[in-house]
């Protein structure tokens, strides 16, 4: 049996990517300057074809390429953030001829996959401060968006952590230009296969264990197949780059969050289910997401919010994020208010009171992300909006956000009928679609929000090292008692608990 070396692992990935119709080219065959990290001819060809109808010129294409190359690698995080924004959201390009209309440029065609050029390149020599040869680089339209680094599983001294260090230390130091364009990285030894942000600590690299989201999660060699077929399916790959890589508006740390597979599949399936159940044609039950505690549900909400806000179908919806505790509200408010660029809406605000909520929602026709607590919905809240493009996303949807039933209370004034907070919420926004996130799904949750659309179990979370496993070990406590004392205690209880009995038998309390 032949050894599974790094070269063979590299070839295995190339073959699996080829099955996804990603063509292979050896880096030694490319005609390029050794310091170039862009495949300029691929990018030039894509832009010329895509914008031919707008009569884009060669000099304008050269200007776009020059603009990308001129971003400095010395400030790598900020440059990567800028370029990722250009890649994910596109940009307006001002024409050389002032009489020509500006062009909205997309570096990736997200609507028509066939218009993009996917290419996996190995053995490409890149000269920066030193010469380096990454194991693999996946290009889309000439942009080096994914970098692969492999280690052999049969070499005990080499691990995928070494691959991580190779990327984030040696390559970062010697060829930083490559990582200006990087969406994410993959480290693998064939058995352990993980993806993550170039700026993330090693522990935030994760496996991609499912292909479509419906299978049982896999491990070992099978996880290499699930990663390539799941993450590098062309449609999913550009969707991840488009909608599922989050960089905060402001950050003291170099934060870049690449979605994990449960976050991706949950957000996508919830989005589809919201469309299906949206009023007036649906029942307004957008679905329930069941996720293990600590599994990153808030990021799933963030990705879902971007999908909804960028959707043509929903026509710039209004999103209402509802929690049942002030600390959760503060946490979500902090996260979402720092994601205005990612979500694509500057109107992300925390609602301070019932009156504030009424003022912000009444008369609004579109847009806005409002964060509030369920307790602000009481019986004095009248109709706020009858629009159907309002989406209410509830966190901890198994608690106070499901109490729709009537309650009868007897007071000094007589019998009073009241309802739970959820009833007043639904009355205030009768045509909204409601989505529930919970770590404890109960029947009442499903009655209000609809069926579980996606679940990420505690077992899966532990396997992915998101949740730490806690094991209870039962033990019988060892108790040593003097037999004479036991006899004295028995006499005490036989005497009806009389303290005098204890005194008679000489028991010292």
Model-inferred region functions:
Residues 351-370, 383-387:
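Conserved motor-coupling elements within RecA-like helicase/translocase cores
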Residues 326, 348-358, 373-379:
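Conserved helicase motor
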Residues 186-188, 370-372, 392-393, 433-438:
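Structural recognition of the conserved hydrophobic beta-strand(s) that form the central parallel beta-sheet
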Residues 217-218, 446-509:
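Interdomain helical connector at the RecA1-RecA2 junction of SF1/SF2 helicase-like NTPases
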Residues 2-318, 323, 327-343, 365, ...:
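ATP-dependent helicase/translocase motor core
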């Amino acid at each position: 049996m032949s050894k599974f070396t790094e070269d063979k692992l590299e070839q295995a990935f190339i073959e699996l990517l080829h099955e996804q119709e990603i063509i292979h080219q050896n880096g030694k065959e490319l005609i390029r300057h050794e310091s170039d990290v862009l495949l300029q001819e691929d990018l030039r060809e894509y832009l010329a074809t895509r914008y031919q109808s707008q009569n884009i010129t060669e000099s304008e294409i050269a200007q776009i390429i020059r603009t990308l190359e001129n971003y400095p690698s010395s400030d790598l995080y900020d440059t990567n953030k800028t370029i990722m924004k250009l890649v994910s959201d596109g940009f307006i390009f001002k024409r050389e001829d002032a009489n020509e209309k500006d062009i909205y440029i997309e570096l990736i065609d997200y609507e028509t996959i066939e218009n993009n050029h996917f290419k996996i390149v190995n053995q490409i020599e890149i000269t920066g401060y030193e010469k380096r040869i990454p194991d693999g680089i996946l290009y889309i339209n000439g942009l080096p968006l994914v970098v692969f680094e492999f280690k052999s599983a049969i070499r005990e001294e080499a691990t995928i952590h070494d691959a991580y260090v190779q990327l984030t230390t040696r390559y970062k130091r010697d060829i930083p230009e490559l990582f200006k364009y990087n969406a994410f990285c993959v480290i693998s030894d064939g058995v352990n296969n993980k993806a993550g942000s170039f700026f993330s600590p090693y522990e935030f690299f994760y496996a991609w264990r499912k292909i479509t989201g419906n299978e049982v999660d896999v491990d070992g060699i099978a996880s290499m197949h699930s990663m390539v077929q799941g993450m590098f399916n062309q449609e999913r790959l550009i969707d991840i780059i488009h909608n599922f890589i989050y960089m905060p508006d402001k950050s003291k740390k170099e934060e870049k969050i690449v979605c994990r597979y449960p976050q991706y599949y949950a957000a996508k399936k919830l989005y589809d289910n919201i469309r299906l159940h949206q009023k007036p044609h649906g029942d307004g039950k957008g679905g329930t997401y069941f996720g293990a505690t600590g599994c990153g549900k808030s990021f799933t909400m963030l990705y879902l919010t971007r999908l909804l806000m960028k959707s043509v179908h929903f026509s710039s919806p209004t999103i209402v994020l509802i929690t049942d505790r002030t600390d959760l509200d503060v946490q979500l408010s902090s996260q979402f208010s720092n994601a205005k660029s990612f979500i694509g809406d500057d109107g992300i605000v925390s609602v301070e009171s019932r009156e504030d909520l009424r003022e912000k929602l009444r008369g609004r026709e579109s847009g806005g992300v409002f964060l509030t607590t369920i307790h602000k919905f009481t019986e004095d809240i009248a109709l706020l909006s009858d629009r159907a493009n309002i989406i209410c996303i509830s966190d901890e949807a198994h608690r106070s956000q499901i109490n729709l039933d009537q309650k009868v209370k007897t007071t000094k004034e007589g019998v009073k009928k009241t309802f739970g907070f959820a009833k007043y919420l639904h009355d205030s926004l009768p045509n909204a679609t409601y989505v529930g996130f919970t770590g404890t799904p109960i029947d009442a949750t499903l009655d209000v929000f609809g069926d579980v659309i996606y679940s990420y179990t505690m077992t899966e979370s532990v396997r992915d090292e998101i949740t730490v496993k806690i094991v209870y070990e039962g033990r019988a406590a060892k108790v040593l008692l003097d037999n004479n004392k036991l006899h004295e205690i028995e006499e005490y209880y036989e005497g009806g608990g009389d303290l005098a009995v204890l005194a008679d038998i000489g028991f010292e309390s």
